[in-house]
UniProtKB/Swiss-Prot annotation:
One of its GO terms (molecular function) is manganese ion binding. Its cofactor is glutathione; Co(2+); Mn(2+). InterPro entries: IolE (IPR023952), IolE/MocC (IPR030823), IolE/XylAMocC-like (IPR050312), Xyl_isomerase-like_sf (IPR036237), Xyl_isomerase-like_TIM-brl (IPR013022). GO terms for biological process: inositol catabolic process. This is Inosose dehydratase.
């Protein structure tokens, strides 16, 4: 299964959490990438403890035969002047380009509640009006063109608590944006958490999917988040997310759709948990074994 153009990566968020820095504060950058390599992963996204000096970061990764797959970028196209987002995006793009990454992960954070500790994730989500949708799509097309200038692709990350979370919102975004400028990051965990049919979304947009986050969920924990009106971050602390093979999502059909459509790019394990409870190396190894078992990668 899968051709040689599919790579495996893992996100540092299991070791150190960017949104809640107390989670994993004791874990160093070197420990993080060493354990990723030890578990058998090639790529990483960029965490808050990673050096931003290209040469320093490259050397640390090359010592472990690793590379940067991408890094998250927060856009504020619906709440701030476009120029502010563009300036930050160009800087982000150039850093990733220097690191050899091919895709740029973008998520609209205007009106987002994902980082609010007390806002119920299932109740407080903002819904864009038509004018805001137009602003978002036009801005993303411009950013996508800037990515293309460097031979890179903008991959949009649908995410819990943001203005693009549901199937309907993903449909709207895909419809309003240029398919040659704006691509999709498929995140299994965020779709299932939201109550969507992740497989159907993947089937519909597989040819625009250029980056994949393999995230599993514990359905009982998600039900508790909904019942107790917890925030996204409170859900993370509760253990709503985990690595593939440890939760309730069946990844075999997901792998099959990707393989049948000749997916190329990264399959990146991303599962934020409390590292004091879920040992990052142990869970990285668990994920790696599961992926090997199901895909032979």
């Amino acid at each position: 299964m899968f051709n040689s153009n599919v790579k495996l990566g893992i996100a540092p968020i299991a070791w150190t959490n960017d949104d809640m820095p107390d989670l994993g504060k004791e874990n160093t950058f070197e420990q993080c990438i060493s354990e990723m390599a030890l578990a058998g992963f090639k790529g990483s996204e960029v965490g808050n403890k990673y050096p931003r000096d290209v040469e320093v970061l490259k050397k640390a990764l090359e010592l472990r035969d690793m590379e940067i797959a991408s890094a998250w970028f927060s856009a504020f196209l619906t709440t701030k002047p476009y120029e502010e987002t563009e300036k930050a995006f160009i800087e982000h793009r150039d850093f990733l380009n220097a690191m050899g990454a091919k895709v740029i992960v973008v998520s609209e954070q205007g009106h987002s509640i994902q980082g609010q500790m007390e806002t119920p994730i299932f109740d407080g989500k903002y819904v864009l009006n038509e004018e805001e949708w137009k602003t978002l799509a036009e801005g993303l097309n411009k950013l996508g063109a800037l990515a293309k200038e460097k031979g890179m692709k903008l991959v949009y990350h649908h995410h819990m608590g943001t203005v693009v979370q549901t199937t309907e919102e993903i449909d709207k975004l895909m419809d309003l944006t240029d398919e040659n400028l704006v691509y999709l990051l498929f995140d299994s965990g965020h779709l299932v958490y939201s109550g969507e049919d992740a497989l159907e979304v993947l089937k519909k947009y597989v040819n625009r999917v250029k980056h994949v986050h393999l995230k599993d969920i514990r359905k009982k924990k998600v039900e508790e988040v909904k019942r107790d009106k917890l925030s996204f971050l409170q859900g993370v602390r509760k253990g709503a997310f985990t690595v593939p093979g440890d939760g309730d999502i069946d990844f075999e059909p997901i792998f099959k759709v990707l393989d049948d459509n000749n997916y190329e790019g990264y399959l990146l394990v991303e599962a934020e948990q409390d590292p004091a409870i879920a040992n990052p190396l142990e869970y990285a190894i668990k994920a790696r074994k599961y992926i090997k078992e199901k895909t032979n990668l």
